[in-house]
Amino acid sequence: MTVFEKHASLIMLLEKYGFSLVGENLNGERVYLKDRRNLDFSDPCKAFPFLSDRVDHAGCIAIDMGYHDTMFASSELAKTLQERVDRSVANGLKKVYIGSPYSLAFQVGDPVFIYRKFTGTQGRPGYKSCITSYCLVTRIERIKTRGRELMSYEQYRRIIGNKSVFTDQELLEKYIISDDLTLIELLYYGFFGAGNNVNWVWLKNNDCWPGTHPLNFRYSREQFDRILQEGNVNVENVIVD
């Protein structure tokens, strides 16, 4: 990738996502390169969009379809009219999930699938609820537990920034009303695309639906690879040595 020195903000973004300066063109453009043979997996942004071959498990996050379609706008479905709200979270690579889980089967650095939960009334939910995307967990913060505040509202709001699907008022209400509140920051690694999403029926029939709450799913490496393949993803182009 080439960029002129005056484009400082773009250069900062390239360097944040693992591109290195390797030279200059005759016209003064800087040449930046990202080498998949030399990735820094200690920093998810620098390794993006690749995952380390050391991955041995993955988690899952279920999101109601209305929120999903705004938060993951690129994760399209075939033959489905998806309603979206125009918010900045749709365009960013970083997303924030906010919920009240009792427990989580994943931690920072783990990949997770995004499961679009069908909440409509038309059609069969088993075919309309599906995994559409995969992310990497970059941060987990307990905001409140058993009614006790572990973080001020200002701190909580600052971490979220523009990465949530919720409005300011909704975020405030969650902070006030919820006894337990957890923030999960995600880096949006990829999506399957219309016609490739992996529905609940396939997951159940292929031993990929453990039967507990999705936040407690712990997929093995073999299951993780199998779901990616079913989503028409070339695993060798995602998981590298």
Where are these regions (language model features)?
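Residue-level detector of short, conserved catalytic/binding motifs and their immediate flanks
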Residues: D110, S133, I184
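Short coil-to-beta-strand transition motifs
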Residues: R124-L136
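Histidine- and/or cysteine-centered catalytic micro-motif in compact active-site loops
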Residues: K117-T119, L136-I140
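Short coil-to-beta transition motif at edge beta-strands of beta-rich domains
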Residues: Y102-Q122
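Active-site-adjacent bridging/hinge elements
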Residues: L81-V89
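Contiguous surface segments at macromolecular interaction interfaces
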Residues: M1-T2, K6-L77, S88, S129, ...
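Short alpha-helix capping/helix-loop boundary micro-motifs
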Residues: G92-Y102
